[in-house]
């Protein structure tokens, strides 16, 4: 039993004396790790910022385009006279010369494309 205790104390003493690291070495190691962590954080932050800017650009692009659900205002309906220089026909209509009806009124009407 005494040999076990003696061996344990001997191993414990060796581990304590040889296992102690230099305090400056520990500080240097911690500084390296924190600097690496900071550089990784900066890299991740820049990457996230780029992705957010791309997403924002896509969202702004969607809002800048005309919405298909929005109603056109002040457009001219089908079979209504229009001006050839300033056609304000509704979407899906085009300002053309009439074929049969309306030839004696105005020269252009809104027709389906």
Curated annotation (Swiss-Prot):
SS bond partners: 75-90, 82-95, 89-110
One Pfam family cited in the UniProt record for this chain: Toxin_22
Main location class: secreted
InterPro entries associated with the record: Toxin_22 (IPR012627)
Keyword Transcription: no
GO CC terms in record: extracellular region
Signal sequence region: 1-21
Tissue: Expressed by the venom gland.
Localization, UniProt: Secreted
Source superkingdom: Eukaryota
Propeptide feature ranges: 22-74
Membership in a protein family: Belongs to the neurotoxin 14 (magi-1) family. 01 (HNTX-16) subfamily.
Function: Probable ion channel inhibitor.
Domain notes: The presence of a 'disulfide through disulfide knot' structurally defines this protein as a knottin.
Name this polypeptide is given: U11-theraphotoxin-Hhn1m
């Amino acid at each position: 039993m005494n040999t076990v205790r003696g061996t344990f104390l001997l191993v414990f003493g060796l581990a304590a004396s040889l296992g102690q690291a230099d305090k400056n070495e520990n500080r240097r190691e911690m500084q390296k790790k924190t600097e690496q962590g900071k550089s990784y954080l900066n890299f991740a932050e820049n990457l996230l910022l780029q992705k957010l800017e791309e997403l924002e650009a896509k969202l702004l692009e969607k809002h800048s385009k005309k919405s298909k659900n929005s109603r056109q205002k002040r457009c001219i309906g089908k079979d209504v006279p229009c001006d050839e220089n300033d056609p304000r026909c509704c979407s899906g209509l085009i300002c053309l010369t009439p074929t049969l009806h309306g030839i004696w009124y105005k020269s252009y009407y809104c027709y389906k494309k």
